[in-house]
Amino acid sequence: EASCAGVRIDMIVRGICCVRAGVPGRTENLHIRSLVGRYLEHGRIYSFYDGVNTRIYIASGDFLTRNTECRVEVGVRVEDPVLKEKLDSILRLQLSDNVNAREMQPDGSYQKVKPAPGEPLVNSQMGMYDLLRDDWTARDKAPAPASVAETPKPQPVKAPEKPAAPAKIGRASC
């Protein structure tokens, strides 16, 4: 519906994708990319822009039916501006990949994304590696925040006298 209303939709789908992108009159505004490279990653980052505001969410699952109907998954809106910017930069990096990216065609096949003449090569997986390495290096060099440094060590807890009865757990049909 959003595609038919003229909304541009960019999706990064690592595996199975049941919707066809670029079908005239249906999904011509839907662009689906697959990133397959050295690392098996899928961020489960969801970004929505209404022309004024960007809302970013992270989730434990994707939108496969088994995840939305048969599992307990969680999604949360990211409010912290620093985290929002970091997640947005990850999405922009992945959407600009022209080394590992394949784009879905209207027939369901995928075509390798090629850089335009003179455009630099963008490998989002190596970019993510560099970003995380730099982040961890900076974290290692920074002094621990006072709240972390002063956190008391956990004390051993005595076991209960009588063990609790085991809970009865049913089986899901999924």
Language-model region placement:
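PLD/PLD-like phosphodiesterase catalytic module centered on the HKD motif
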Residues: 1-173
